Amino acid sequence: MKQLLQQLLVQSLEVLMDNNILESMPENIRVDHSKDKAQGDFASNIAMLLSEQAQCSSKVLAQKIKANFPDSVDVEKIEIVGPGFINFFMSQSSNALVVEDIIKQGGNYGLSNIGMGQRVLLEFVSANPTGPLHVGHGRGVAYGAAVAHLLRAVGFEVDCEYYVNDAGRQMDILAISVYLRYVETEQFPDNCYKGDYIFDIAKKISGVKKLDIFTNTCKDTSEWKVQKNSIDKERYIDDLIANCKLQLGSDYRKVFDFAINSILSDIKIDLADFGVEYHQWFSEQSLVDSGLSEEIVKKLQDLGYIYEKEGALWFRTTDFGDDLDRVVVRDNGIHTYFSYDIAYHLGKFERGYDRIINIWGADHHGYIARVKASIKALNYNPDKLEILLVQFVNLFRDGKKVSMSTRSGSFITLKELREEVGNDVVRFFYILRKSTQHMDFNLDLAKSKSNENPVFYIQYAYVRICSVLKQGMPFMADIDLLVLNNELETLLIKELNRYKDILQSSALNYEPHVLACYLRKLAGYFHSYYNNCEFLVDDDKLRNSRLLLITAVQQILANGLNLLGISTPNSM
C-alpha cells in the first residue's frame, strides 16, 4: 500500500508541476505507517518538504496535493492535520487484501529483491579461541545470524565469516596454560587461563601420548629461567612462554595447535548446535605464514605512511582521521595485531564484495578509526566497510548479577545457557533489544512459561492458532473478508499490513529487534482476539473469514520467527 500511495502522490505532484506550482519532483517521497489509528493508516510529510519550492505554507501545499490526488478505490479519505501532514485512510477492502496475499504467498510473503543480488561479507563473533563461547559472545552470534537472514530476505547474497585469531601472544598464553596443566605444576600463574576446559585439554593430550605427540616432554619446570617473584606478571608469563618453546622445541607447536584446535572444534560444534553456519573460517595464522602483513607494511612504507620511532614502525593513521598514529611492527620485530587486521581487511576488499560488514563488541569502538584509516590509505573506500557494535550482556540469576571472566575461568558458557533455557529463548532474548544498548539477561524470566516471557508469548499465539485450525480449516469458496469489521479484526489486519515494511526496515537498518518487537505486538493482538471472539461460529462466511485471518497471522508469525532463527512448535 505504501508503494501505491507513493505512486498516487507522484501523479498529484506532476499536476502541480504542470501548473508551475512545483519546479521539480523530489527523489524520495516518504510514506509511513501512522502511529495513531485516529490519524489514519499512512501519513506523509511531503508538503512540508516542498513548501519552500512551492513558495507557500506547507498546509496550503498539502491542500493542493489533496485536491489533485487521483481517485482510488483503495483510499477512503485524506485528511490534512497540523502544519501540513497528509493522513491517508485506506478502504476496508484494500486493507483486507493483505490476508489473501499472505495466504497465496505463504513463506515467501514479505521477501523482496531490494538488494538485487549484491554480495555481502558479514563477519561476526570472531571470538579468540582461548576458551569456549560464553554468554557475552552469544549476543553477537544471535545478532549476526539474524542480520544475515534478514539481508537474504530482501535480496542480498550474504557470506558469513569467522576470523580465527590463532596467532599472537594470547595463543601462546593458551598453549602455556595447557602445558602447565599437563605437567601438573604446583605454581600456576595468575594470568594464565584457569578454566576447567584447560584441564580437559591437558587430559586429552595425556590420552594421545601413545600417538607420540611429544618427543621432548619434560615435566620438570624447575630449571626454567623465569623470574618467579617478579612483580611484572606479564614479564613472568613471557619468560614461561620463552622457556616452554626452548624446552619443547618443535613439540611446542604441537601443544599450541592441539590447544587451539580443541577449542575451535568446540566453538564450531557450539555454533552448529545453535543453528549458526559460516561459509568461511579465516585463519590469522595464514596472514603470518603468507607474509601478507609484511607486504602491507612494505606497501605503506612505499606510500610514505610509515615512520620509525624508538625502534618500532609506526603508521601515520592520523593522516586519515585517526586520533593517534599506530604501531604496526614492534621494536622486537614482531608485527602487531593491527598489522594483521590491515592485511585481513585489504583481503576482504580484494575479494570483490559490494558490502563488507563487521560486527564487533562495543569495547572495540576505538578500533574503528584506525581500521578505516588503513583502508583509506590503501586507496579503498572506507565507507564500504560498515562496523556494527554489540553491547555487553549482564546475566542475572535470582535477581543477582553473575560475574564472569574468561581468564579466571569464571563464566557461563553459551552451551550451558542454551541447555538451561533453550535455543529459542536465548536467540530471542539476545535480539529483543537494540544491539547498541546494554542488555540484562534475566534467567528467571527466560525459564518462565508466562506471558511476560516474550518467546513463550509469541509461540503460544502460534500454538493457539494451530489448535483452532485443527478443529476447522477455512473453506476458501465461502469467504468475505469485509465481514471482518470489529475493532480487534481491524487491528490485526492493519498490523499484518505492516509486516513488509517492518521486514525491510529491520534488514536495511540491521535491526532485528524491530522485527522481534513487531512479532510480540502481533501476538498480543491475536491473544486479545482469541480471548474475545469465537471462531467456529454458525455463520459460514464469518467463520471461514475469521479462520482465514488467523491463518494469515500464523503465517506471518512463522515467517518472522524463521528469519530470527526461532522455531514454531505445534503444541506446548
From Swiss-Prot:
Q: Which GO terms describe its molecular function?
A: arginine-tRNA ligase activity; ATP binding
PANTHER family recorded for this chain? ARGININE--TRNA LIGASE, CYTOPLASMIC, ARGINYL-TRNA SYNTHETASE
Q: Which SUPFAM superfamilies match?
A: Anticodon-binding domain of a subclass of class I aminoacyl-tRNA synthetases, Arginyl-tRNA synthetase (ArgRS), N-terminal 'additional' domain, Nucleotidylyl transferase
What's its catalytic activity? tRNA(Arg) + L-arginine + ATP = L-arginyl-tRNA(Arg) + AMP + diphosphate
Output the CDD domains linked to this UniProt entry: ArgRS_core (cd00671)
Please give the family membership noted in the entry.
Answer: Belongs to the class-I aminoacyl-tRNA synthetase family.
Record-annotated membrane-spanning stretches: none
> Where do we find the motif 'HIGH' region here?
127-137
Which organism's genome codes for this protein?
Answer: Vesicomyosocius okutanii subsp. Calyptogena okutanii (strain HA)
User: How is this protein organized at the quaternary level?
Assistant: Monomer.
Q: Which GO terms describe its biological process?
A: arginyl-tRNA aminoacylation
Pfam families to which the protein is assigned, alphabetical: Arg_tRNA_synt_N (PF03485), DALR_1 (PF05746), tRNA-synt_1d (PF00750)
Per UniProt, subcellular location reads as: Cytoplasm
Main enzyme class: ligase
Disulphide bond pairs: none
EC number of the protein: 6.1.1.19
GO cellular component terms, semicolon-separated = cytoplasm
Question: What name has this protein been given in UniProt?
Answer: Arginine--tRNA ligase
The record's keywords, sorted A to Z, are: Aminoacyl-tRNA synthetase, ATP-binding, Cytoplasm, Ligase, Nucleotide-binding, Protein biosynthesis
